Amino acid sequence: MFYWLTELAGTIPGINVFRYITFRTGGAMVTGALFVFLFGPWIIDHLRLAQGKGQPIRADGPPTHLMTKKGTPTMGGLMILSGLVVSTLLWANLHNPYVWVVLMVTLGFGFVGFYDDYLKVTKQTHAGFSGRLRLAVEGLIALFACLVIIWAGRDSSVMHLGIPFAKDFAINLGWFYLVFGAFIIVGAGNAVNLTDGLDGLAIVPVMIAAASFGMIAYLVGNAVFSEYLQIRYVAGTGELAVLCGAVLGAGLGFLWFNAPPASIFMGDTGSLALGGMIGSIAVAVKHEIVLAVIGGLFVFEALSVIVQVASFKLTGKRIFRMAPIHHHYEQKGWTEPQIVIRFWIIAVMLALAGLSTLKLR
């Protein structure tokens, strides 16, 4: 919305600053943080009142969770999504199709997660939304998003898969790219969802990934920088940095309330939405494989569940004491703050490794 003020650049001194993505990204970050700080307590109070017993705690999980987390409200993702939407509407260029497609994925996945949280809270069960139906809905949202991204790209090379460290090599996936892109988006959403099991564990790596992809989006969307770095230029994607800034701000605000002991949980409302958002940005900026590096922590968490389930079905034995992997370390005696902070450190290192692919070609 503020971007439209640039039309008055000739009449109001200084108004031209709203043209700059970097300025608007900073504005979105501050707005997102302030929104969550101001309205967070009100949202938490209303969710606690509406939910009563709060999020059901796994009986087969670490015993300490039954004592420290019982009664904590969930659906905290509503705080993040509200801050994100308000910030984006204020600071982003709303004529940009990439802004709308990423918002669509974020809110679509957020709605799926909200319904899942609603079923869990009202029925006090972990069953929630049917797994297959949930994946089907997510898949349809992701497929539509990929169609819009292909349309916005306006040339066939948008269906090429870039390879990190290779400046002149890409794999032409053709229309199979639709399926591949949808897999990336759905996979990212559910990987973040699996990571969200300890206070503060998911939100900081999400913010790290958002900051990383905000930088990538800015560089990919800038013809000069993309030529210098020899990465593919995708016109218009620089605007996605504003959304990443909004997530950073809203995430900081949420972390204030989610820091241990958490006053509220993100829930599927937040984890699915934020994962889907990062996945859709990765697809839009043509750095799908780099997502597996920057979001390596999420990949590791998801793989631990896949390996655990496959091993138990095939051999009757479990590889980990408990999955996802963060619960395995809890069972080994690591404290919750140890796990969370160490995983944050891993997320930072992976983000740096992913960003290095921009220069090492």
From Swiss-Prot:
Annotated membrane topology: Multi-pass membrane protein
The keyword tRNA processing is assigned to this record: no
Record EC number: 2.7.8.13
Keyword list, A-Z: Cell cycle, Cell division, Cell inner membrane, Cell membrane, Cell shape, Cell wall biogenesis/degradation, Magnesium, Membrane, Metal-binding, Peptidoglycan synthesis, Transferase, Transmembrane, Transmembrane helix
A single Gene Ontology CC term: plasma membrane
Main localization category: membrane
Pathway per the UniProt entry: Cell wall biogenesis; peptidoglycan biosynthesis
Cofactor requirements of the protein: Mg(2+)
Pfam families (alphabetical): Glycos_transf_4, MraY_sig1
Membrane-spanning parts: 27-47, 72-92, 94-114, 133-153, 169-189, 200-220, 240-260, 264-284, 289-309, 338-358
Subcellular location: Cell inner membrane
Enzyme class, first EC level, given as a word: transferase
GO biological process: cell division; cell wall organization; peptidoglycan biosynthetic process; regulation of cell shape
Catalytic activity reported: UDP-N-acetyl-alpha-D-muramoyl-L-alanyl-gamma-D-glutamyl-meso-2,6-diaminopimeloyl-D-alanyl-D-alanine + di-trans,octa-cis-undecaprenyl phosphate = di-trans,octa-cis-undecaprenyl diphospho-N-acetyl-alpha-D-muramoyl-L-alanyl-D-glutamyl-meso-2,6-diaminopimeloyl-D-alanyl-D-alanine + UMP
Annotated InterPro entries: Glycosyl_transferase_4, PNAcMuramoyl-5peptid_Trfase, PNAcMuramoyl-5peptid_Trfase_CS
GO MF entries: metal ion binding; phospho-N-acetylmuramoyl-pentapeptide-transferase activity; UDP-N-acetylmuramoyl-L-alanyl-D-glutamyl-meso-2,6-diaminopimelyl-D-alanyl-D-alanine:undecaprenyl-phosphate transferase activity
General function of this protein: Catalyzes the initial step of the lipid cycle reactions in the biosynthesis of the cell wall peptidoglycan: transfers peptidoglycan precursor phospho-MurNAc-pentapeptide from UDP-MurNAc-pentapeptide onto the lipid carrier undecaprenyl phosphate, yielding undecaprenyl-pyrophosphoryl-MurNAc-pentapeptide, known as lipid I.
Protein family (similarity comment): Belongs to the glycosyltransferase 4 family. MraY subfamily.
NCBIfam families per record: mraY (TIGR00445)
Name listed for the protein in its UniProt record: Phospho-N-acetylmuramoyl-pentapeptide-transferase
Organism of origin: Afipia carboxidovorans (strain ATCC 49405 / DSM 1227 / KCTC 32145 / OM5)
Gene: mraY
